[in-house]
């Protein structure tokens, strides 16, 4: 069978993209290297859509939870993954958890039943130079293909190590303690050109005693261990975990990410120092999305366990009540700097016949990966049908996630991201915080319905 679309990778994104195309009668070749003599260090078998790290798709609450809303939106788009999850579901309270083997088998059976879909167990080593292609090879892309992608995109555009710093919701930061400023007021001209006011960082101050206590918490905090196949991956200077830096010496953090120089704290203003004084140490947060709702803890990539991160980082002045959109981590990964390399339709700008989907685009999580695969499939289907493609509204989970990875995120600090309400266009400021999540989901559902009517 001569294919119209080549999909590389049979994980969550690749299988969902293949389903969306095949059910529209489009001829698809789905290449998966597992089962063809190759595997990855993380997979146990060769099943399509094999779940590696967890059997949970997280919350299924579509009224108060962003990932639950994403479940809802995918179901409305006839998602194969959501249908398979329903058949493989196991008790897990309000979460959607599945039997991994049943889930994978359901996905594969549904795809094999499609007459226009061919599943080929083969490793693809080179990025295709022509023909419609979707690359959905995930975080453990084969080295040969990763090298080919790196050649096509530039050596600095393909990361092989996640340096994930925590991200905090802006409205949970105590600005009665923290303040806005840039070090030495540098970069004001560039900031103003980008629509800022020259004060681009949120700064959380520490006294000497607070700093020393915080350092001890970092050193004592319970940490996760590298998986066996990650253990030999070297640290890079820009990926050094915060607790590893802390262990190098008492002052290391103060001369690194917690450097206080050039940052006058106006809350500490006196008659002698009307602009305030420098703290002993400072934790800086940098805006992480264009909406200004999410702020990245600069230099705070970490291997602390998630519960420890919440506990330890809430000892930082100004972050006592911090709510985290994403917690930090450090692990081997392969992902593109998508805001730089991809257009709004997930096409590689330098080779528009190639689209990327799933975790390699910088989305994080099973559901997010599948949703981006679904969108890639819908985009290609529209292209083949000769139809204009309109992306889902940014008020929806699908639209917010797509916008984030294709341009809304800051390219210089781009890291993998789960779906969360901080990515959405804000609801009206008059909506009370208690009902804000319901406002997001109700608006999304209404806007999604209108968008679905436009699909091919």
Swiss-Prot record:
One of its GO terms (biological process) is tRNA methylation. The keyword NAD applies. FAD binds at residues 9-14. The keyword Magnesium does not apply. It catalyses: uridine(54) in tRNA + (6R)-5,10-methylene-5,6,7,8-tetrahydrofolate + NADH + H(+) = 5-methyluridine(54) in tRNA + (6S)-5,6,7,8-tetrahydrofolate + NAD(+); uridine(54) in tRNA + (6R)-5,10-methylene-5,6,7,8-tetrahydrofolate + NADPH + H(+) = 5-methyluridine(54) in tRNA + (6S)-5,6,7,8-tetrahydrofolate + NADP(+). Keywords: Cytoplasm, FAD, Flavoprotein, Methyltransferase, NAD, NADP, Transferase, tRNA processing. Its main location: cytoplasm. It is found in: Cytoplasm. It is an enzyme of class 2 (transferase). Its EC number is 2.1.1.74. InterPro entries: FAD/NAD-bd_sf, MnmG-rel, MnmG-rel_CS, MnmG_N, TrmFO. GO terms for cellular component: cytosol. GO terms for molecular function: flavin adenine dinucleotide binding; tRNA (uracil(54)-C5)-methyltransferase activity, 5,10-methylenetetrahydrofolate-dependent. Its cofactor is FAD. Catalyzes the folate-dependent formation of 5-methyl-uridine at position 54 (M-5-U54) in all tRNAs. Belongs to the MnmG family. TrmFO subfamily. This is Methylenetetrahydrofolate--tRNA-(uracil-5-)-methyltransferase TrmFO. It comes from Novosphingobium aromaticivorans (strain ATCC 700278 / DSM 12444 / CCUG 56034 / CIP 105152 / NBRC 16084 / F199). The gene is trmFO.
